[in-house]
């Protein structure tokens, strides 16, 4: 595999992708994240410098840091919200036996890969259209 100079190399756990006007955005959680605020990344899958932002998992709020300063437009917010509310691509079940949605999966990815800070079990799924 050829690594381009502009690519970052780190562990990531991809939750999925959404597409807007031909641009594919990936939603992922970094593994062993040094930050103590549970968040996920939303970025242009093919051009990381074109669009990249971070969003908190527990509330509808941006977690801007470093070069990750972009803001979602209304269409991107709706795509993100629809994605988070949708069932996971691979069938997964929560502890009550209900099928997991993508937001629950993102929570699980954070908790599985970032042991310093876990998301409380009573956290309510935010409405990401309110970003």
Q: Model segments located where?
A:
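Metal-centered catalytic cores of metalloenzymes
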Residues: 1-131
């Amino acid at each position: 595999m050829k690594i381009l100079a502009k690519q970052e190399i780190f562990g990531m756990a991809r939750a999925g992708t959404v597409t807007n006007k031909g641009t594919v955005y990936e939603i992922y959680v970094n593994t062993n994240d040094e930050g103590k605020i549970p968040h996920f990344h939303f970025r242009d899958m093919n051009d990381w410098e074109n669009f990249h932002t971070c969003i908190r998992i527990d509330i509808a709020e941006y977690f801007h840091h470093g070069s990750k300063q972009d803001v979602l437009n209304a269409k991107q917010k709706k795509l993100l919200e629809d994605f988070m509310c949708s069932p996971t691509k691979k069938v997964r079940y929560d502890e009550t036996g209900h099928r997991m949605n993508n937001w629950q999966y993102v929570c699980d990815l954070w908790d599985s890969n970032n042991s310093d800070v876990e998301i409380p079990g009573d956290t309510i799924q935010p409405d990401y259209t309110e970003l």
